């Protein structure tokens, strides 16, 4: 053990500890700006400086090793003045337009200026402005960069992408896209982890609120919104709502208060993804297709493969993500059921919806996947009535609320735009949702809870856990077991794929056939897994990868909390919701069975492939 004293308080810590650990362990405090626990301790900002008796210069607490007998002072006049000077210098190079910054009120630099009582900056203002393509889903404002290098560290150590790099040195130190490339050329996966770890507004997601507001105000548009599983765990954080108020029902009511005509649950899309992806897995296990099969619902992961390992794209499931499956079904199936005609040629022929069909309530008498409703029988079910009730002829504007930045890219991929109309028109992150609620002055706490709209309102528990790492794998195995055996497994039979470990592996028996699975979150972990597969060190049948550590619960579009990682807590909320669901299997969802009965026939049918599958090799970056 190493013994030291911090502001008069003795402390003993293991060898190898840093001064900052001693400070916090002793109940004292030092501010930080560039530091990220376990990721970055480069001491670039010099905000965490402390005074050590016998040492002439001040030292950064974050990366100075703790030595036996150290006497540390965190708040001497010299220390405080040095911090004030260092933060003032940062402010002199910062475009201090706080009122119009997305991080206003949630900015480390802003907090430091207030904490240190900096009322004026006595240095010449020298913010730097670098041009940026603001149509790209990720925006960098160089005038707000404080050169903390967090983005460089996270992109390298956590994601292994190395998009950001140091430019110049010493007093001319700057950060930018590596090798002088544009962001489009540098291989950015749009995971957004640099955004959630940036201490200021230098990095943000493209804001699409104005496009949504324009649609909401258009009388010729029907606005529908779909809500991803992980959003329900975090949306209240943007408004400082306690979890008991930030319920699913109040979330649905909030979207209605914002003016949306329909509020749907992306859990329906997740259940459909499981049916298609699980069926595809069984096909591949039977020798049809490249093995192992990789999940395909994370666009950050798809971008990573396209950029780093284009030779591995055949391993991806062809199933679209829940967002995109939902979008396709909304505009081609549900839109017709509700009396809206999508502006696409052949839409009536594409969706064989029965005339006078209900809104998907009730369970089909034919089990999904039995072949009882093949393409021919569905086509014979009758064409949609042109006189169906509803806002006939109005255009559907489909908004998705996601915990993800890469979803903005995915929605705009040419493969997801049929005719001239995208399946998903706009994507809002959870942070944008919070800003939209404030903009529209919605008093969320005063709203009564309401359900999501039919026919996409009742997702299974399997769909809910999509938002946690391992959730897609667990949900797929639940239904794959049923498709093989005709009976349900214990819904908790596959919980061993849960957890925040970066790379997990397990084998399960699916009716006499052993299935070897792996789960990875964080792209640096995914790279290690790919290398092991390539080297023949491991063999798997099914691999789930989520670009963000912890999965969508830790997504790049989630609320930002300085020095706190909440993916684990949010994941636990999703597991609790799963346990409370009346239906915990995707194949038992009433809306899923009705959709196959009325529209698709069975998983992997021709119609299902046309609507719910894609070829990622054709995606443009």
Where are each of the predicted segments found?
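Short structural boundary motif marking the start of a folded domain
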Residues: 1-4
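Short strand-turn-strand beta-turns centered on an Asx-Gly dipeptide
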Residues: 6-9, 53-54
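Iron-sulfur-associated redox domains of electron-transfer enzymes in respiratory
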Residues: 15-69, 75, 79, 206-621
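Fe-S ferredoxin-like electron-transfer domains
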Residues: 46-190, 203-222
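Mobile "lid/hinge" segments at catalytic clefts and subdomain interfaces of large enzymes
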Residues: 162, 195, 433-434
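Helix-enriched interaction subdomains in cytosolic or periplasmic regions
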Residues: 182-206, 306-310, 427
């Amino acid at each position: 053990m190493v013994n030291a004293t911090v502001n008069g308080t003795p402390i003993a810590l293991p060898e190898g500890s840093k001064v900052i650990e001693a400070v916090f362990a002793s109940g004292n405090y030092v501010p930080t700006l560039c530091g990220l626990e376990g990721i970055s301790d480069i001491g670039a900002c010099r905000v965490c400086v402390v005074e050590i008796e016998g040492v002439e210069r001040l030292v950064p607490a974050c990366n100075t090793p703790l030595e036996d007998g150290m006497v540390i002072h965190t708040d001497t006049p010299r220390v405080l003045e040095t911090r004030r000077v260092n933060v003032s210098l940062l402010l002199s190079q910062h475009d201090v337009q706080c009122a119009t910054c997305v991080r206003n009120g949630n900015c480390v630099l802003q907090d430091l200026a207030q904490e240190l009582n900096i009322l004026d900056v006595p240095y010449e203002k020298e913010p730097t402005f670098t041009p940026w393509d603001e149509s790209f889903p990720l925006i960098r404002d160089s005038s707000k960069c404080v050169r903390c290098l967090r983005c460089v560290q996270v992109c390298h150590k956590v994601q292994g992408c190395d998009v950001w790099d140091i430019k110049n040195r010493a007093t001319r130190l700057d950060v930018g896209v590596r090798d002088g490339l544009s962001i489009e050329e540098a291989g950015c996966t749009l995971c957004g982890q640099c955004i959630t770890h940036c201490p200021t507004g230098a990095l943000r997601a493209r804001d699409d609120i104005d496009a949504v507001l324009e649609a909401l105000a258009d009388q010729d548009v029907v606005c529908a919104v779909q809500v991803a599983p992980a959003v329900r765990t975090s949306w209240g954080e943007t408004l400082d709502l306690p979890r008991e108020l930030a319920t699913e029902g109040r979330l649905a009511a909030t979207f209605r208060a914002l003016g949306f005509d329909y509020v749907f649950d992306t859990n329906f899309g997740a259940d459909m993804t499981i049916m298609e992806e699980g069926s595809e897995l069984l096909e591949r296990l039977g020798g049809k297709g490249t093995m192992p099969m990789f999940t395909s619902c994370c666009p950050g992961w798809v971008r990573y493969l396209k950029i780093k390992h284009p030779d591995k794209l055949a391993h991806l499931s062809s199933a679209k993500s829940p967002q995109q499956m939902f979008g396709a079904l909304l505009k081609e199936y549900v839109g017709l059921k509700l009396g809206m005609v999508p502006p696409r040629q052949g839409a009536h022929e594409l969706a064989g919806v029965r005339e006078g069909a209900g809104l998907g309530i009730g369970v089909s008498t034919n089990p999904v996947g039995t072949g009882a409703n093949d393409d021919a029988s569905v086509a014979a079910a009758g064409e949609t009535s042109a006189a169906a009730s509803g806002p006939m002829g109005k255009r559907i504007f489909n908004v998705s609320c996601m915990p993800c930045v890469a979803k903005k890219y995915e929605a705009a991929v040419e493969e997801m735009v049929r005719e001239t109309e995208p399946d998903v028109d706009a994507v809002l992150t959870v942070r944008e949702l919070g800003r939209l609620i404030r903009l529209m002055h919605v008093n969320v706490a005063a709203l009564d809870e309401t359900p999501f709209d039919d026919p996409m309102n009742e997702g299974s528990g399997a769909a809910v856990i999509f938002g946690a790492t391992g959730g897609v794998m667990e949900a797929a195995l639940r239904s794959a077991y049923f498709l093989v055996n005709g009976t349900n497994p214990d819904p908790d039979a596959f919980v061993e794929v849960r957890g925040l470990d970066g790379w997990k592996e397990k084998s399960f028996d699916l009716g006499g056939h052993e299935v070897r699975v792996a789960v990875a979150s964080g792209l640096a972990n995914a790279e290690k897994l790919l290398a092991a597969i390539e080297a023949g060190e491991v063999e798997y049948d099914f691999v789930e990868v989520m670009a963000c550590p912890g999965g969508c619960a830790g997504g790049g579009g989630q609320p930002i909390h300085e020095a706190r990682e909440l993916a684990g807590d949010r994941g636990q909320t999703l597991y609790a919701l799963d346990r409370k669901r009346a239906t915990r299997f995707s194949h038992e969802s009433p809306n899923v069975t009705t959709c196959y009965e009325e529209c698709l026939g069975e998983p992997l049918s021709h119609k299902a492939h046309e609507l719910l599958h894609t070829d990622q090799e054709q995606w443009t970056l």
